[in-house]
């Protein structure tokens, strides 16, 4: 079942994978069953009903300081929910994002049979009795009747009034500062006036230009619909695409005066607008709608009329009421005594952009935007604030579609993979050229944060080149705190398996074989995929990593980790209920002896015992909660001082390695199973045995 925006649906039929960002489910509050308020959150339990008469039990979660109050008969639109389950034949849903249903503008011609168009203009209560046989049609009729009673707030009425005012005042506005607007802009009316129904008149261009010009930071979803002006410079233009309904569309990326970027998508008169827009030029975009696309905003030009007005054309024919200022995008570029007209500024910036596209290094514009002059490691990409950079990395995963190519790349600088998204035209050029495990140069890519994750994407300056030095990367599991190593394919690198040095401890019932770190690494690298093996080693604990997360949450039911939702509420998918989780420690550190060092993961029981050994006042069962409280209260220094007492502390470690395969790569993870206090007597016997072994080897040689 395909969802449509504003449609009425039975929640138990909704597949989470089909719940897209732009689609919303309409529900009506039938009864308020209870509510709970904490310091920062408010939880309201309601019995709701949809347009088909199906009931659901919904838990609403909202900020306590927003003063939002749900009441009976309120109509809300569910925009995002975390899960749903059945309880007493009712669907139970945890809703995290919603809005009150506000409807005063409907387009019956475009509304589908089970779809209503709901916009943020005026709150309208839809009574349950109004929703009968066909909920969509009844809602449409009700809203139409309601609009007649509230005609002063109707968007259609406002548009009609605006048209009438334009006609009445058209003669007075024909001439501004000696220029005849209708004559001056008749040459661009054909390429900038799109759509079937006219909301804007080219003769009233001065009215349009007087609309508020917003920056990207000022854009809000549902506000100023069709009634604002956005000024931007086109920095990227995609190819045209065709969707399943055989309609064309394309998108661009534009920069505002603060160098922020936003995507603009165009769905009407695609061929004309595609020819109008040129990369590197400034335009006024009038009549767009701000939409939420995943975690980013975009301007969508699909419903209603819109106009694209080249700013270069305006500077030649129109004296703008506001004084034109030099573009802020030039940073410290010296303009001198040159003309401050927009025409000259566009020519200058277009020339600079062209130099950057041709790869010249004297690109001031790009340098002011933190252009990278050398190839960075992935670990540097994750930390840098540079916007443009280059990377040499190995491709470990490829996902290709008609619209883009999505890669995962890695190198030996850290344990994290980096996502790369390649859009047209590089997408078409490299669609069949990437190979798993090969190394490539990704030159002049744009660094962006998407879903709290660092990614790279291409623009018009980006290029890709296959590296001449192909290397093999052995990846050690990131979750268990270990490293990566790259080996040149062209070299003669190999692993030498040395004779095992061991000592059997006959003083205890348990027979132990002690190994060195070097021996453990050798056996791990020579092992087969799927193999596990345990070792005992005398070693020092060094460098517990404070930069990594030190704890996680688990449910008592099956010991599975749980997700932390907004506020302090936790929901276990196994129990299907809200829980009070347990806090467990997970420490990443290094174990070292005289032969080498390996990174290890130390989980809750062993980590808690270490903390208890340093400070006996911290009970083993309370160590996780103690660390969590210190971090949340900004007392990381206490934890840092606590861990510093463990630096180079000597223990007997039981260590397990596991050889895995992930994405056609070899992964070796080391985990600490047991930690014991050092035994000087037993270690002395082990060292004596090791010394005898070395002496015998030297005599034989």
Swiss-Prot record:
Result for mutant: residue 648 to A: Does not affect single-stranded telomeric DNA binding; abolished telomerase activity of the holoenzyme telomerase ribonucleoprotein complex
Zinc finger (C4-type): 555-575
Pfam families reported for this sequence: Rep_fac-A_C
Subcellular location: Chromosome, Telomere
Residue positions binding Zn(2+): 555, 572, 575
Gene3D superfamilies xrefs: 2.20.25.10, Nucleic acid-binding proteins (2.40.50.140)
Disulfide bonds: none
InterPro entries per UniProt: Euk_RPA1_DBD_C (IPR047192), NA-bd_OB-fold (IPR012340), Rep_factor-A_C (IPR013955)
Effect of residue 601 to A: Reduced single-stranded telomeric DNA binding
Swiss-Prot/TrEMBL GO biological process terms: telomere maintenance via telomerase
Consequence of gene loss (knockout): Critically short telomeres.
GO molecular function, one term: single-stranded telomeric DNA binding
Protein name as annotated: Telomeric repeat-binding subunit 1
Organism: Tetrahymena thermophila (strain SB210)
Gene from which this protein is expressed: TEB1
